[in-house]
Amino acid sequence: MQERRWYDPNVPQTLAIAQILLYINGVFALLFGGVGGDGSLIIRLLFLASIAAYIFGAYGIANGRKLGWQVAVVAAFSPFILRFVDTLIAFEFFSFAERIRYVIGIGRYGSGILSTIFDVALIALLLHPMSRNHQKIWFS
């Protein structure tokens, strides 16, 4: 029987750091994300799905699953996807420039530049050539 683990220190450092960031993003989104907020039902359901994707992606990477890496990549892009869908649904009064700033995560309604930096760093870690080559060769 194969041992299941939550963290695998034997993967390249890009994937090891990505695992930690995925867990941190998932926990912080659950604690401080406002699941019961005043957003539309579609956004709240997509938000819950992205939290599950963060945790499942990190767990899948730790257990050497190709599906885990793929879900982690989708989860890493989810903040930008959620903000884009949110602008399509709720923010018709935004100008085009304000919508772009909101989707990127900066501006008066965005999540903040520091959060955006960590979102981009997670994407870079998962799509780094070392991470991609490792998952192609070793993940099942």
Q: In which residue ranges do the predicted regions lie?
A:
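Topology signature of small-to-medium multi-pass alpha-helical membrane proteins
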Residues: 1-140
